[in-house]
Swiss-Prot record:
Native source organism of the sequence: Pseudomonas savastanoi pv. phaseolicola (strain 1448A / Race 6) (Pseudomonas syringae pv. phaseolicola (strain 1448A / Race 6))
UniProt keywords, alphabetically: Cytoplasm, Magnesium, Metal-binding, Pantothenate biosynthesis, Transferase
This protein's name: 3-methyl-2-oxobutanoate hydroxymethyltransferase
EC number in record: 2.1.2.11
Family from the record: Belongs to the PanB family.
Gene giving rise to this polypeptide: panB
Main location per the UniProt record: cytoplasm
UniProt: Mg(2+) binding residues: 45, 84, 114
Catalysed reactions, semicolon-separated: 3-methyl-2-oxobutanoate + (6R)-5,10-methylene-5,6,7,8-tetrahydrofolate + H2O = 2-dehydropantoate + (6S)-5,6,7,8-tetrahydrofolate
Keyword Nucleotidyltransferase in record: no
Cofactor detail note: Binds 1 Mg(2+) ion per subunit.
Cofactor dependency: Mg(2+)
GO BP annotations, alphabetical order: pantothenate biosynthetic process
GO CC term (a single one): cytoplasm
Amino acid sequence: MPNITVTSLLAMKQKGEKITMLTCYDATFAHTASQAGVEVLLIGDSLGMVLQGHDSTLPVTTAETAYHVACVKRGNQGAMILADLPFMANATLEQTFINSATLMQAGAHMIKVEGAAWLGESIRLLAERGIPVCAHMGLTPQAVNVLGGYKVQGRLEAQARQMRADAIALEQAGAAMILLECVPSELAEEITQAVKIPVIGIGAGSATDGQVLVLHDMLGLSISGRVPKFVKNFMTGQPDIQSAIRAYVAAVKDVSFPATEHGFSA
C-alpha cells in the first residue's frame, strides 16, 4: 500500500471510495493491519480501557500515547498514523501545541482532538504550523462526565443543527478530517455532504466517508462483555487476525458494514 496522506484521504472522498480506520497500539498489529489494507491507524485514548483496564479514557497521558505512537510507527506499512490528544492535553493553546508536537515527533501524521466549535482556535493554530487535525464530534468520551454517560448525541433538532454548524466551522478553521461518534445516521450523512473534508464514522451509519472500530472490539475481545451496538465481530469464521481485518476492510469498502442495525435513528 502506498503511503496514505491527507491528500490521499481527500481524493478517496472525492472518488467515493470508503476509508478504513482501526485503533492500533503496537508494532505487530500495526504491521498486520496496514498489510491488510487499513488506511488509517488510530492510537486512541481507548488504550486506557482496552490495554490499561481503566473504566474511561481520562487517565491516559500524552507520554503514554506517544509511547504507543512510536510502537505503531515501527510496524506500520504505509498507513496514516492518527494520534489522540488525551484528556486536558489541550486545556490551553500552549499545551495544545506542545502536546501535539510531542505526538508528531513520536511518529503521528495527524492529531485527533475531541470537542466542538470551541476547538476552532486550536485547530487553526495547529494547521498553520503544519499539524493536520481530525476533529472528533458527537459522543466525545473525554466529556463522558458532562454528557452523563456514553449516549447518542444529536437526536434533538437543536443539537443536530448545532453539530452541523460546528462541523462546517471546524472545516473552515482548518480541520483535515472529522470523526463522528454515536450520532443518528441521517445527521451523519448530512454532515458528510456539508463538508469537503473526509468524515469517518463509528456508530454513525454507512453514509460517512469511512469507518473506524476499536481493534479489540472487532476481534471479539472484551473485558466487560458489553459490546456496543455499532460493533461487529469480524473474527467469526476467519482463520486468523489478518483475515478478520481484511474482512473488515472489504465490508467497509462494499458498504455491507455498517448495516442498519449498527446505527442509530434520530
